[in-house]
Amino acid sequence: MFDVIDFFCGCGGTSEGLKQAGMNILLGLDFDKDALETFAQNHPDAQVIHRDIREVSVDDLLRLIPGLAKKRRKRPLLFSACAPCQPFSKQNRQKSSDDRRISLLSECERFVVALEPDYILIENVPGIRSTSADEGPLDRFLSQLKALRYQEPVVQVLKAERFGVPQLRRRLIVMVAKNGRAVNELSETHGPGKENLVTVRDTIAKYPSLEAGQTDAIDALHRAASVSPLNLKRLRATPVNGGRLDWNADLRLSCHSKPGHTDVYGRMNWDRPAPTLTTRCVSVSNGRFAHPEQDRGISLREAAALQTFPEDFQFAGSTISIAKQIGNAVPPLLAKKIGENFTRHYREQNGKNKRRPKTKR
């Protein structure tokens, strides 16, 4: 079993998946109070730090978990560093090279130097590699790992739907080992010649019908955001698989005639994976986030399911906060498969998957 320190843990999507892969979550660190409360509810045995990572020292971690020190460790240690992705996202139109969040990944270096984790996982949007013409934060961090004699990093851009996640979501991951050979790349499990892609229908068709603004009587997370009377008219005018291009002129705004953002007010397609869920994934005016048939946006429960959170996962905060937590999260199913990949590497390096030699009779 691995021990895990989850920097920038958010609500705990990565930790949930790593836990499902058999790992032990020691600590989560995040600056978002609601997200950290969600993490704590779902990982009650883990320590939590509600502070900016720039204000956290190595000694702070060692005071909470003395066994982190390399000489005292009994199990392999994994650092997960999924730093905020907004500075690198294509959807961030106000990104700036001065955005202080860009430096957050480099903050992990001092923890790596002091504690020498056996494995490191980095997850972000693909744009983290193209922040500027100069060497970006990821390349700088990987150069630092090389200087610390870590193995060659495996850098992959994954399509989450090719790993069983019912959502089109491209993410860059980096997997690094301290000892032995490099970690293997992840192999896709879904798509042409493999298992079928998991669809919106497969994932959310089971949930009860709702009206906009309604909350299910049994499941409080299955609640749909309210919409204005005009937006309700727009939803009623949107056919299955349709969007705002299907409306009559009286329902359109002047901005709707401009190119781009054609997905807003669009319905999800029952028989395809969902579009990428964002921090506003329950708002019909912010993407193709309308229910495939019902005249409402998807509920928080449906959004969580499309991100592969289990039914018993508890969320803290307001509707806006929970939607943000869900949209920011690493899909637990994807994290589980990454965790299993690390575990295979460890077992192979330690001879636990090697065949025993045949004994002579």
Identify the role of each PLM range.
Residues 164-167:
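Short glycine-biased active-site loop of nucleotidyltransferases that positions the nucleotide triphosphate
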Residues 2-5, 9-23, 147, 171-325, ...:
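S-adenosyl-L-methionine-dependent DNA methyltransferase catalytic core
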Residues 50-51, 150-162:
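Conserved S-adenosyl-L-methionine
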Residues 125-130, 322, 326:
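Conserved short loop/turn motifs at secondary-structure junctions
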Residues 61-64, 156-161, 260-262:
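Short alpha-helical segments and helix-capping/turn motifs at coil-helix boundaries
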